[in-house]
Amino acid sequence: MWIENKIFQEDMENIAQAAYIPWEQLMHKTLFITGATGLIGFNLISALAYVSLYKNIPLKIIALVRDEEQAKERFQEILATEAPLKFVVGDLENIPPVSERIDYIIHGGSPTASRYFAEHPVETIMINLKSATHLLELARKNQSDGFLFLSSMEVYGGIHCREKVNEKHAGFVDTMVPRNSYPEVKRMVESLCACYADEYGVPAKSIRLTQTFGAGIRKGDNRVFAQFAHSAMQHEDIVMFTKGGTERDYLYTADAVSAILTVLLSGKAGEAYNAANEEAYCSIKEMAETVANLDIIKEKYNGPVSVVIDESKNDGKMYPPELYMDLDTKKLQQLGWNATRNLKEMFTRMILTMV
């Protein structure tokens, strides 16, 4: 998949060419990354390896992984090069000691499935809180140059009217709902980052990512955007288990990587930044209809296909209530960042890397 794929190689080159990313700050630096084998982590590590190999930005990447063999498979094409990537085997609850000085930490590891939040709320809280505390301590002891926590738009809670949501928006989260373990602990970790910045001088920041997808998804990815694409590619109806009324922005994987690096290197310590493509705002149903009618689905997969709503399997626990999440990204844009891919492009490029 890596740079042998035209789409993925183009993504890596676009990230490397982003003039607003101060790449020189990463020269001869070591980055510690969690969530390495996930969609965002994979794209992030790929981009860092790319600039190291092809853009004369010497750096080191240390990735925390649970299963070294699976990680080797995930990154096999990168490992076949001279890319400066090595693995530390452990999990978020038991992060092993790292002997090298760590200059930057990007904490992207976390459970991400709604079903997991609902069925394992205690573990959701403890894994996030323990891992963040451990890594912030690591940053403090190393006097690291930067720490970035990958947070979520879910920290804003349920917003039931259409309005722009900036970083100062105070949304409501019902703490008595177990599934809300996820947004609540994300809020707590954001606060912890701000506190470490204030009390200990750790340059910790948070980035609130909207739902992100694009090149680099795994074959078995079961998230909604992947389900929609798989159904359309197999010429099957796209079946939804809610009315799909929730509206939000989306973000392409490469745009997420450039946003992460921008906040890590140029963001202000103790602050949070929204990351989304404001032009890719739509309902889940509208997103499904977009996929069903993509040109690539018509041309290569005998499309279009139909969108069907079947709420018979929805017990009300697995899906958050209908809401609106239109993130305001002016604060991030002031650092020079901008999104580059619209919704149709996101899906088209994702599908072209799934083939």
Give the residues covered by each predicted segment.
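Conserved Rossmann-fold NAD(P)-dependent oxidoreductase catalytic core, especially the SDR/UDP-sugar
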Residues: 133-180
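NAD(P)H-binding glycine-rich loop region in Rossmannoid oxidoreductase-like domains
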Residues: 89-127
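Active-site segment of SDR-like NAD(P)-dependent oxidoreductases
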Residues: 111-115, 153-160, 210-213
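N-terminal Rossmann/SDR dinucleotide-binding element
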Residues: 1-104
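Active-site helix of classical SDR
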Residues: 181, 185-188
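C-terminal substrate-binding subdomain of Rossmann-fold SDR/epimerase-dehydratase oxidoreductases
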Residues: 1-4, 232, 236-355
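SDR active-site strand-loop-helix element
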Residues: 34, 64, 105-108, 147-153, ...
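NAD(P)-dependent short-chain dehydrogenase/reductase
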Residues: 159-168, 191-248, 253-264, 284, ...
